[in-house]
UniProtKB/Swiss-Prot annotation:
The keyword Iron does not apply. Residues 321-343 have a biased composition (Polar residues). GO terms for cellular component: chromatin; nucleus. This is Insulin gene enhancer protein ISL-1. Acts as a transcriptional regulator. Recognizes and binds to the consensus octamer binding site 5'-ATAATTAA-3' in promoter of target genes. Plays a fundamental role in the gene regulatory network essential for retinal ganglion cell (RGC) differentiation. Binds to insulin gene enhancer sequences. Defines subclasses of motoneurons that segregate into columns in the spinal cord and select distinct axon pathways. Acts in conjunction with LHX1, LHX3 and ISL2. Binds to insulin gene enhancer sequences. Essential for heart development. Keywords: Activator, Developmental protein, Differentiation, DNA-binding, Homeobox, LIM domain, Metal-binding, Nucleus, Repeat, Transcription, Transcription regulation, Zinc. One of its GO terms (molecular function) is DNA-binding transcription activator activity, RNA polymerase II-specific. The gene is ISL1. The lineage of its organism: Eukaryota, Metazoa, Chordata, Craniata, Vertebrata. It is found in: Nucleus. Residues 181-240 bind DNA. Residues 312-349 are annotated as: Disordered. The keyword RNA-binding does not apply. InterPro entries: HD, Homeobox_CS, Homeodomain-like_sf, ISL1/2-like, ISL1/2-like_LIM1, Znf_LIM. Residues 17-70, 79-133 form the LIM zinc-binding domain.
Length: 349
């Protein structure tokens, strides 16, 4: 008989609180997935001491529990410019490992907002647009130094194909030079550039209908728009080839300017922020120990009923119990509904 009494003792589990280490005798046990159990009074945020229960989102990191607000504040991804976190509906701009709000994705020198398709340099002290980067580079390297990969070989403004015109050539020579045909560039304003770049970021090869819409929106001629897209595609292709060659020659090569490290990049389209949390929220379950279930059932039902006797046998888990899965299911249908979910894991009273 002594051997027959051992198996039930082995099956009984003792719930220990992760917070205080003591055994849990409370009416309710808070379980943090997958197998952490707490007193209701011990499950609190490690920062603000807010009590956590099944109605809250709980995060566990390095053995400490946090509410959602404090976890995002401490460990969530923040904007590299304003150091403010992101909501799940925010669109963000990325530059290597740094993430920015769309409004914060600006040149630190001129405060111009960078849009998809813009060229910029990522340095230790922030983002620099192409123009300001070249100004600092020329001042640092001097006018006689050879052009670096980031130096423009043409005007910084995005220019379309020039149209023909006649004007006298001004040369500082003593002898008079004859007039000749020169090419005048069509300089685009900021609004026109923004429209063209936005369209290019969405589709580098627009169809005829889209080009007609761009003509109406920008006031430029179809030929200017067509050539602008051709030049832009050619320029991006050359830059891509150049960057690949530089990466192959010197994988860790970066442009060092006045002690600052600048990495040439091209702004991509904004993307939705996915939260960036380094841990997933865990579920907190509240359940009653089996002894509490038996007590409530005994107060509301006749203890001589077969269902109650079967529930007692199932809780004891003795070897003489013949309860099956179907009998347990039939017993559960006779139990009164309770506001809390019950977990069928036995606990030592």
């Amino acid at each position: 008989m002594g051997d027959m009494g051992d198996p039930p003792k082995k099956k009984r589990l003792i719930s220990l609180c992760v917070g205080c280490g003591n055994q849990i005798h409370d009416q309710y046990i808070l379980r943090v997935s997958p197998d952490l159990e707490w007193h209701a009074a011990c499950l609190k945020c490690a920062e603000c001491n807010q009590y956590l229960d099944e109605t809250c989102t709980c995060f566990v990191r390095d053995g400490k529990t946090y509410c959602k607000r404090d976890y995002i504040r401490l460990y969530g991804i923040k904007c590299a410019k304003c150091s403010i976190g992101f909501s799940k509906n925010d669109f963000v701009m990325r530059a290597r490992a740094k993430v920015y709000h769309i409004e914060c994705f600006r040149c630190v020198a001129c405060s111009r907002q960078l849009i998809p398709g813009d060229e910029f340099a990522l340095r230790e002290d922030g983002l620099f647009c192409r123009a300001d980067h070249d100004v600092v580079e020329r001042a640092s390297l001097g006018a006689g130094d050879p052009l670096s990969p980031l130096h423009p070989a043409r005007p910084l403004q995005m220019a379309a194909e020039p149209i023909s015109a006649r004007q006298p050539a001004l040369r500082p020579h003593v002898h008079k030079q004859p007039e000749k045909t020169t090419r005048v560039r069509t300089v685009l304003n900021e609004k026109q550039l923004h429209t063209l770049r936005t369209c290019y970021a969405a589709n580098p090869r627009p169809d005829a209908l889209m080009k007609e819409q761009l003509v109406e929106m920008t006031g430029l001629s179809p030929r200017v728009i067509r050539v602008w897209f051709q030049n832009k595609r050619c320029k991006d292709k050359k830059r891509s080839i150049m960057m690949k060659q530089l990466q192959q020659q010197q994988p860790n090569d970066k442009t060092n300017i006045q002690g600052m490290t600048g990495t040439p990049m091209v702004a991509a389209s904004p993307e939705r922020h996915d939260g960036g949390l380094q841990a997933n929220p865990v579920e907190v379950q509240s359940y009653q120990p089996p002894w509490k279930v038996l007590s409530d059932f005994a107060l509301q039902s006749d203890i001589d009923q077969p269902a109650f006797q079967q529930l007692v046998n199932f809780s004891e888990g003795g070897p003489g119990s013949n309860s099956t899965g179907s009998e347990v299911a039939s017993m559960s249908s006779q139990l009164p509904d309770t506001p809390n979910s019950m977990v069928a894991s036995p606990i030592e009273a």
